[in-house]
Swiss-Prot record:
It is found in: Cytoplasm. Keywords: Cytoplasm, Methyltransferase, rRNA processing, S-adenosyl-L-methionine, Transferase. This is Ribosomal RNA small subunit methyltransferase G. It holds the Pfam family GidB.
Amino acid sequence: MKKQNIPEEILSLLTEEEINMFQELQIKIKELNNKTNITRLTDGDDYWVSQVFDSIWPFKAFTNINFDNKKFLDIGSGCGFPGLAYAITHPNSEIYLIDSLKKKTDAIKILVEKINFKNNIHVINDRIENLAHHSSMRNNFNIATTRAVSNPSTVSEYILPMLKKEGFGVLYCGKWTNEESKNLDKTLEILEGKVKDKKEILLPRNKGTRNIILIQQKRLCPEIYPRKVGKPEKNPL
């Protein structure tokens, strides 16, 4: 397949096989989008930068951490990002993709069936506030993330209960302020986590600034978290 429209910053991060899989995924998402609208980010830079690059670069940026052969959780996966992107670039990892909308999880299941992923991939239609209190899911993941735009403290309340001790949470943010940093530190103290590292990047093709906050579970999160549906959003810790 032709690669002239793919930014060089992305090509430099991927193997030939991975590029081909992302191109195949793009085709399948477009086909699916014609039947059921799951995302508007399907063409050009919207796909290659806002979907693909934004999903994979955090796991390339923290070079001192091994992200291979892990149990990975994508919360609020939407049309499958970053979970399916992580699956392509980390074929030895086991992937869980969760979304509360059945329309989205049905679409992801179709994508998983149509593309030859090497991973063991699980797609679950439920809310994280419910799943986090199931013993089969809680404290069960090496890595958890969500690209859903939300308060970092709220996202941390969803992520940390799912992590094994010393597991990593990947928080996606736009611009990062001192006030947000202080609020997150306060939340992490309650949830028994800590900030491990932070990276900032200018996304290719003028797609804006992206900050990634890498958090880590120090001790198992208190059983009462996450709180009931709606509370983490309305009243962040």
